[in-house]
């Protein structure tokens, strides 16, 4: 008896579990039917609005009746005995709780509306075929029935079909890979991508692709492997002359980096160029964004490292695609076009300093002008890029026309080496000329920061001392006159630098290194000079070398004035470099032979 009771309980539990599963399936069936009814009702309402302008035939609407469901309601109704058992064991779980949203329409009302939908002549539409089988109801495509309606129709790209010529294979695959990458939503699986690629094949290439990608083959749904097989099948050979022209015309444009790199490497295998030349050609074909970012990157060893560096840049600058959500049609962005512009005419934006008036920069920016600038900016960028591409193409065409008919790569490499050597020699000559010009300019205009050391004999020193004592007073007046003229030329009459003459220190033990710096002992209590902020840079042009050996006597001699013609016919006053101190061979040592000491 105990075994029979146990078997009965197990059977009863199994029956209850099966009944729960049956109820759940019936509920899912009804929910799917209601979702389909809502979608069809929305489509019919939209078409009804358009029917007043365009005479379209009325659509066929399915009637959601009881005979269209997989499980009939009268067949699954429980008997009174089963109802008693369910009340004792588990509650009956069939219908979900009713929704309380104010905008929600009840399911019964929706079914009645769809059933009452008739044609204008009064005849009701015939019902559709029964609903699909149970496995199809649980497919993921039916769980999201509104996802397909949101995808816009895909336009076929304007790409020339491929007939099997390996010369055009690289550019053909680059364009198609970019198009598929830009429209990933339309190609969710590999089979769709393979079929889309085969649709652009013609002739023998189409026959080969169809035979290779039949159902059951490994290439039917493997898009990357199918691309590799295409490159192996139509690998050439390509003449080096043709490959050279093709790789020079290859430009990335709006294509992805991966497709451009694959196309470039496919053509590079037919050339005998060295790695440096391949890198230069690869950079010429890159888009402007990558070339700008590569300026901040480190040096690369070969072409593979250059491609990897570009891949890193692509990950940084790539704009993530926004996933299309079901039921969301209008996404707001800061600069989206607003259809009703009259409402936004009064909306204004002010700058941060609007209270200071228009003279201080408080200008008003309107939304309408902002939207126009935002729409015009990409167009200007595209036009500039197109102009740059046209100029590059013209330059390359001129280079191709000027080239010799002999396309042997050894001779080309030799010519390139000779040209590079000539360019390097010219650059070196230009640099030498620039250095000479800079030295001459420095000698003319920038020798105020230099200290000239002259080697004098003991007899000449005494004569020099006498001459210097006589001309001290005259040179002081000339020095003051030069400063007034310079201030008058620059319009800085009120900004003259007031400096007191430094007191010389008789310290024979002071070295050059300690005397060059701006130390307090060089002034001996003299107050620092008072100067304007705009004249602060002038203080670095006056080296304090009063404490050097041999400078205790009045050896300082301002140079004579030099007159230079200005840009506008004005006469400018400029002083030659001044001799601040002189050294004898005994005092100068090894520095006296060089002739100059830079400060």
Curated annotation (Swiss-Prot):
InterPro entries: DUF4939, RTL1-rel. It holds the Pfam family DUF4939. Residues 78-90, 393-432, 439-450 have a biased composition (Acidic residues). Residues 77-97, 116-139, 377-450 are annotated as: Disordered. RTL5 is one of at least 11 genes called Mar or Mart related to long terminal repeat retrotransposons. They do not correspond to functional retrotransposons, but rather to neofunctionalized retrotransposons genes. This is Retrotransposon Gag-like protein 5. It comes from Mus musculus. The gene is Rtl5.
């Amino acid at each position: 008896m105990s075994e029979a009771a146990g078997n009965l309980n197990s059977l009863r539990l199994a029956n209850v579990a099966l009944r729960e599963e049956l109820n759940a399936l019936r509920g899912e069936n009804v929910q799917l039917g209601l979702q389909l009814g809502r979608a069809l009702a929305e489509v019919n309402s939209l078409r009804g609005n358009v029917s007043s302008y365009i005479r379209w035939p009325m659509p066929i609407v399915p009637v959601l009746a009881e005979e269209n469901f997989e499980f009939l309601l009268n067949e699954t109704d429980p008997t009174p005995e089963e109802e008693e058992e369910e009340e004792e064991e588990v509650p009956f779980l069939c219908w979900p709780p009713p929704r309380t949203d104010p905008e929600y329409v009840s399911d019964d009302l929706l079914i009645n509306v769809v059933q009452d939908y008739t044609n204008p002549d009064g005849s009701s539409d015939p019902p559709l075929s029964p609903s699909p089988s149970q496995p199809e109801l649980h497919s993921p495509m039916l769980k999201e029935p509104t996802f397909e309606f949101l995808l816009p129709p895909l336009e076929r790209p304007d790409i020339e079909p491929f007939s099997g010529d390996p010369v055009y294979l690289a550019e053909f695959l680059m364009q198609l890979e970019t198009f598929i990458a830009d429209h990933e939503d339309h190609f969710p699986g590999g089979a769709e991508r393979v079929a889309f690629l085969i649709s652009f094949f013609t002739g023998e290439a189409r026959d080969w692709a169809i035979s290779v990608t039949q159902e059951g083959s490994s290439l039917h749904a493997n898009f990357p492997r199918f691309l590799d097989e295409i490159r192996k099948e139509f690998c050439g050979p390509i003449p080096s002359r043709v490959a050279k022209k093709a790789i020079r015309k290859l430009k990335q444009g709006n294509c992805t980096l991966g497709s451009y790199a694959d196309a470039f490497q496919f053509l590079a295998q037919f050339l005998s160029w060295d790695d440096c030349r391949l890198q230069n050609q690869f950079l010429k074909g890159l888009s402007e964004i990558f070339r700008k970012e590569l300026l901040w990157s480190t040096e690369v060893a070969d072409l593979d490292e250059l491609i990897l560096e570009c891949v890193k840049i692509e990950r940084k600058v790539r704009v993530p695609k926004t996933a299309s959500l079901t039921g969301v049609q209008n996404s707001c962005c800061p600069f989206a076009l607003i259809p009703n512009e009259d409402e936004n005419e009064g909306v204004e934006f002010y700058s941060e300093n609007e209270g200071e008036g228009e003279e201080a920069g408080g200008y008003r920016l309107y939304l309408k002008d902002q939207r126009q600038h935002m729409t015009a900016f990409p167009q200007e960028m595209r036009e500039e890029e197109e102009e740059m591409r046209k100029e590059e193409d013209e330059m390359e065409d001129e280079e191709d026309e000027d080239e010799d008919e002999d396309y042997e790569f050894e001779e080309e490499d030799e010519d390139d080496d000779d040209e590079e050597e000539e360019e390097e020699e010219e650059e070196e000559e230009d640099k030498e000329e620039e250095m000479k010009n800079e030295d001459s300019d420095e000698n003319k205009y920038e020798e105020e920061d230099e200290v000239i050391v002259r080697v004098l004999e003991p007899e000449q020193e005494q004569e020099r001392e006498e001459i210097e004592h006589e001309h001290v007073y005259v040179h002081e007046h000339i020095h003051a006159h030069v400063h007034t003229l310079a201030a008058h030329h620059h319009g800085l009459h009120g900004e003259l630098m007031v400096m007191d003459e430094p007191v010389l220190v008789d310290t024979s033990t002071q070295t050059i290194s300690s005397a060059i710096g701006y130390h307090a002992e060089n002034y001996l209590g003299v107050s620092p000079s008072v100067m304007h902020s705009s004249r602060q840079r002038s203080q670095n042009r006056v080296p304090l070398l009063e404490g050097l050996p041999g400078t205790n006597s009045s050896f300082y001699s301002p140079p004579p004035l030099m007159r230079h013609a200005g840009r506008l016919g004005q006469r400018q006053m400029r002083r030659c470099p001044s001799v601040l101190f002189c050294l004898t061979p005994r005092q100068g040592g090894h520095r006296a032979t060089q002739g100059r000491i830079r400060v």
